[in-house]
Amino acid sequence: MGNLISTSCFNSKEKFRSQISDYSTWYPQPGQHISIRTFRELNPAPTSSPTSTRTETQLNGGNSRSTVEVLEEVNRQLTTHMPRR
């Protein structure tokens, strides 16, 4: 059998883990039944209602946000302004 490849990806809210099985060196025997199942897990669609609250504090006369909040805002702006094909 082939190798088992395991990769991990992290974001600020969830931990993702995916495994890919590589059976490229395996050959079926004559008359052997083969069943291949594939699946894909989709992220839930964003909702219009907020799922978290944002807190801004005054720091030296200006508003301060965490790095996660800034990155989430940039990601939101990028996804809403991307041209659709």
Swiss-Prot record:
Q: How is it modified after translation?
A: Phosphorylated by Arabidopsis thaliana ASK7/ASK-eta mainly on threonine and serine residues.
Q: In which tissues is it expressed?
A: Expressed in vascular tissues, and especially in phloem cells.
Q: Which GO terms describe its biological process?
A: symbiont-mediated suppression of host innate immune response
Outcome of mutating A45L: Reduced pathogenicity on N.benthamiana
Which residue(s) hold a covalent lipid per the annotation (N-myristoyl glycine)? G2
GO CC annotations? host cell plasma membrane; membrane
Q: What does the UniProt keyword field contain?
A: Host cell membrane, Host membrane, Host-virus interaction, Inhibition of host innate immune response by virus, Lipoprotein, Membrane, Myristate, Phosphoprotein, Suppressor of RNA silencing, Viral immunoevasion
Bias (Low complexity) ranges: 44-57
Q: What does this protein do?
A: Major determinant of pathogenesis that affects the hyperplastic response of the host to viral infection. Mediates the induction of cell division in permissive cells, mainly in phloem. May act as a suppressor of RNA-mediated gene silencing, also known as post-transcriptional gene silencing (PTGS), a mechanism of plant viral defense that limits the accumulation of viral RNAs.
- List the protein's name: Protein C4
